[in-house]
């Protein structure tokens, strides 16, 4: 199972608790705006918007902010920006692969901020295609365990196209092809299982084990990248053992 997923879960829990909360809110709001602009402002007919709103609600974004973002994206209210998705590729400490997904209204600013964060934290930019081939676009649904077993989840989602269910400690992660994401999410809902988020994400096709020191350096790089308002998501191919995760949790 992907150490990056366990890491991402830990990072999300920390983000909700600390000063990064405001930045997290801003990124979720941007997702809603883009989803509404791309597929229309009605969540019932726009699964991407539905899922963007669900994730924002689960992260405690105020309903007023969610509704205003939906209206801006749908053109019902003025003020929506022309957000563009831009992908950057690079290498982190010890040659770890890094894929950076930006959502920006200023390509030059985004490129500059990504480059500065990389070079100041032991990373380097890479040519397009030199890193992205190490990742696959997947549908990812995360849900809190509560009293569920892995078999409970698997039974609910198997026929909907789920490929695997990963145990991430306090949560489960259901992986599918992006085209099966909505079916998997709906299968969970029909089984009466609540979920935290459902979104398309990049998953490493092969993960690289790293020691604690390298993990700390990669963590520092990812944090620096995510500090940019233009950066939505950062993906790496690190594989963190339980021992390394435990050491990181103590930091």
UniProtKB/Swiss-Prot annotation:
Keywords: Cytoplasm, DNA-binding, Transcription, Transcription regulation. InterPro entries: Integrase-like_N (IPR017856), TACO1_YebC-like_2nd/3rd_dom (IPR048300), TACO1_YebC_N (IPR049083), Transcrip_reg_TACO1-like (IPR002876), Transcrip_reg_TACO1-like_dom3 (IPR026564), YebC-like (IPR029072). GO terms for biological process: regulation of DNA-templated transcription. It is found in: Cytoplasm. It comes from the Bacteria. One of its GO terms (molecular function) is DNA binding. One of its GO terms (cellular component) is cytosol. Residues 1-20 are annotated as: Disordered. PANTHER family: TRANSCRIPTIONAL REGULATORY PROTEIN YEBC-RELATED (PTHR12532:SF6), TRANSLATIONAL ACTIVATOR OF CYTOCHROME C OXIDASE 1 (PTHR12532). Belongs to the TACO1 family. This is Probable transcriptional regulatory protein MAB_2888c. It comes from Mycobacteroides abscessus (strain ATCC 19977 / DSM 44196 / CCUG 20993 / CIP 104536 / JCM 13569 / NCTC 13031 / TMC 1543 / L948) (Mycobacterium abscessus).
